[in-house]
Amino acid sequence: MDMYAVVGNPVSHSKSPKIHGMFAQQTGESLEYTAIQAPLDGFRETVESFFIGGGKGLNVTVPFKEQAWNIVSERSHRAELAGAVNTLLQRDGRLFGDNTDGEGLVRDICVNQGVALSGKKILLVGAGGAVKGVMAPLLDEGPASIVVANRTVSKAEDLARIFGRNGVVCARAFADLEGPFDVIINGTSASLAGDIPPLPDAVIASHTFTYDMMYSLRDTAFVAWAKARGAAHCCDGLGMLVEQAAAAFYLWRGVRPDTAPVLAGLRQGD
């Protein structure tokens, strides 16, 4: 039976084994998918051991996505732009890295939530690896503009410089934001700790679609903040998790699973 796994630290909380198990059952693919906690200083060795032992593919989660980018022999174009890798497989004995996070986000927003991004004013909150990983796929949708807001403005300016050739991208401090925006995407993990960045109320209106890339059993702090300010359409990142997993599954197996029943099952299970 073909072996796959997710590698992270910590990783015991990961929903990936359940998601890929549901994909395998649905598609009739014969595989086993587990979770592997790699030592913080032993990621490369963990990956090498997995593939030497006959493993077929790995998902990579926090905090190893940047390390994964560095150890591969080849990268997809989107992984190259993202500076991070979340999916590994071997091709002709060489380690290949891809990044399906941005595809997962865009598919969840555009397909599952039915929100078109073309021509929209988008606010991206945060300027870390999660935001960098989704910038190119968001720009591919043809928004009117993307504003990146971050506590450390220089980090947002770095992203604006890197991706500005692909569309209209600007950097702002939170205090300098003017709105409202059509779409606000939170790419920080702060809301899981009950915290949100100091966003002015002017950025949001009733028509604003708000999306938290994080997810939890209850509303994240960001989703609660958006609802309290009258946003009619708010969403967490569980759909992104399922969609990026489906993209990885397709890369490995050549079969694209139906994500709707898997997402519904996870929502009910939660």
Curated annotation (Swiss-Prot):
Organism: Hahella chejuensis (strain KCTC 2396)
Gene Ontology MF: a single term: shikimate 3-dehydrogenase (NADP+) activity
Residues holding shikimate: S14, K15, S16, T61, N86, D101, Y215
InterPro entries in the record: Aminoacid_DH-like_N_sf, NAD(P)-bd_dom_sf, SDH_C, Shikimate_DH, Shikimate_DH-bd_N, Shikimate_DH_fam, Shikm_DH/Glu-tRNA_Rdtase
Keywords carried by this UniProt record: Amino-acid biosynthesis, Aromatic amino acid biosynthesis, NADP, Oxidoreductase
GO cellular component: cytosol
Active site as annotated: K65
The protein's assembly and partners: Homodimer.
Protein name (database record): Shikimate dehydrogenase (NADP(+))
Source species taxonomy: Bacteria, Pseudomonadati, Pseudomonadota, Gammaproteobacteria, Oceanospirillales
Family designation: Belongs to the shikimate dehydrogenase family.
Superkingdom classification of source: Bacteria
DNA damage listed as a keyword: no
Known function: Involved in the biosynthesis of the chorismate, which leads to the biosynthesis of aromatic amino acids. Catalyzes the reversible NADPH linked reduction of 3-dehydroshikimate (DHSA) to yield shikimate (SA).
Protein EC: 1.1.1.25
Residues annotated for NADP(+) binding in this entry: G126, A127, G128, G129, A130, N150, R151, T152, V153, S154, K155, M213, G237
Catalytically driven reaction(s): shikimate + NADP(+) = 3-dehydroshikimate + NADPH + H(+)
Gene name of the encoded protein: aroE
Gene Ontology terms describing biological process: amino acid biosynthetic process; aromatic amino acid family biosynthetic process; chorismate biosynthetic process; shikimate metabolic process
Biological pathway: Metabolic intermediate biosynthesis; chorismate biosynthesis; chorismate from D-erythrose 4-phosphate and phosphoenolpyruvate: step 4/7
